[in-house]
């Protein structure tokens, strides 16, 4: 992210991605932090104030519902989608007791979020999809299906610090290999 860009953090709570974006952009530009749960937005506002960040505004709403005023407006759109959380099970062991039905409904929600988020990306802009799970059903299968339906997007490589290094546009981080939580990230560029 660069100073002066417009960024939409579609599933923003608790705000860490928005704060990181603001720092990367030197607090110059516009970051809209959106979340379904209005009560969580107060924490983002408080965090931004505590950090002295003025580029962040908040907006409550369902990321699956189209907002015409945001159409093709953002240089970067972040979708850190609700997921099973299986990548962070060592930190939150109660995850293992979630209903199995969630594993079938989550990809539907994730796909709807991604499809709607795509409408907000300006030509030449970037759409980033991430989850804290390691399940292909919530990760590669969601982004593969999205790209099959959206020819105006393609994966775009990115670089992370070693030991990861260069990627070809998507990556699953594994606790046993990378010393991190389990995590998936896919970067897609709009042509």
Tell what function each PLM region has.
Residues 1-191:
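S-adenosylmethionine
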């Amino acid at each position: 992210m660069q100073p002066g860009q417009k960024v939409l953090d579609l599933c923003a709570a608790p705000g860490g991605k928005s704060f990181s974006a603001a720092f990367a952009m030197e607090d110059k530009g516009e970051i809209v932090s959106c979340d379904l749960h209005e009560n969580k937005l107060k924490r983002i506002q408080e965090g931004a104030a505590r950090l002295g960040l003025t580029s962040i505004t908040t907006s409550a709403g369902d990321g699956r519902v189209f907002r015409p005023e945001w159409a093709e407006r953002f240089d970067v759109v972040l979708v850190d989608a609700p997921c099973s959380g299986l990548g962070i099970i060592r930190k939150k062991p109660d995850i293992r007791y979630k209903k199995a039905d969630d594993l079938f409904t989550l990809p539907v929600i994730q796909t709807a979020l991604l499809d709607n988020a795509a409408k907000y990306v300006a030509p030449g802009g970037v759409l980033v999809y991430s989850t804290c799970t390691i399940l292909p059903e919530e990760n590669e299968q969601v982004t593969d299906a999205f790209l099959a339906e959206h020819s105006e997007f393609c994966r775009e490589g990115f670089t992370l610090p070693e030991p990861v290094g260069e990627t070809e546009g998507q990556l699953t981080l594994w606790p046993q290999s990378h010393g991190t939580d389990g995590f998936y990230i896919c970067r897609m560029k709009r042509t």
